[in-house]
Amino acid sequence: MRSTWSEEPIVVELDASSSDAATNLAAGRSVIVVPDFCDAAERATLLSSAFAEAARSEEELVSGERGPSAAQSNTGRLRLHVPERLPDCGLLGDQLIRRALAFVQRELPGAGEQMLGCSATELPELLDAAPGLEYSPGEPAVNIYTATGEFKPHEDKMGLTVLVTLSDGDEFSGGGTAFWRPSDFNSARRGRAEPALVLTPPAGTALLFGGEVTHAGRRVESGKRCMFVASFSRRKSPAQAHPASSSSAVASEPRLEDGDDLDAFLDALR
């Protein structure tokens, strides 16, 4: 991974008193773009495992080992939870998360305290040291988008999101990730506001942004667009946790049952 990176503003009129990248990232005013975050071999491993799992699930569906879902909808999106659906990629997924934490420590140390409630020196150990990390439901994951696939505007509601492009640009048309200004989040959900920023970075690029940022996966017109995603916060210790917070935070967009996503994805491949 090269040390070069850039800051892409969501809010163009950044306050001069808080113009450092770490503060802007934590406040949801910008997205950090890290090229060459994930190399070709790592991408190939994730993609091979994801496509094999999709094919295996299709065989189960055809053979009757897995019953049809109660509802059918052509979402064009399949979400594969790495620990459960891609266990052979578990170590690689952890490696990418550690890499993101090390990047923040090295390049944006102030973001650790603001976004994850820890000092810069603690960042590299967050994944392994108690109490560990808490993920958005179903993550870390590999998302596969086929024609018509998209992810509606939502917020992840976690401390930090790491989104890594796995597909080369010539493998799909359409797509990209859209971001809205904080003031436009309600309008974005109603489809009444244009995004302030749309990014379609090359394969291997990571996007880092905060949990309150309204964003969406734009509609794929053809081909397959694949992403690795991990949205996480520092897990609260038992002494810090409240009874009402025993369940994980849920992203704002209603999530389909896994079976619904799978059936729609398989329909799109046929």
What do the predicted segments below correspond to?
Residues 125-244:
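Catalytic core of non-heme Fe(II) oxygenases with the double-stranded beta-helix
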Residues 30, 66-69, 78, 114, ...:
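Compositionally biased, intrinsically disordered low-complexity regions
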Residues 27-29, 54, 177, 182, ...:
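Double-stranded beta-helix
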Residues 16, 27, 63, 80-82, ...:
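Generic detector of low-complexity/intrinsically disordered segments
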Residues 1-2:
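Universal eukaryotic N-terminal targeting presequences
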Residues 72, 86, 141, 152, ...:
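Intrinsically disordered, low-complexity peptide-like regions
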Residues 15, 20, 36-39, 88, ...:
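Acidic-enriched, low-complexity/disordered segments with a strong bias for Aspartate over Glutamate
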Residues 5-129, 148, 246-249:
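Non-heme Fe(II)/2-oxoglutarate
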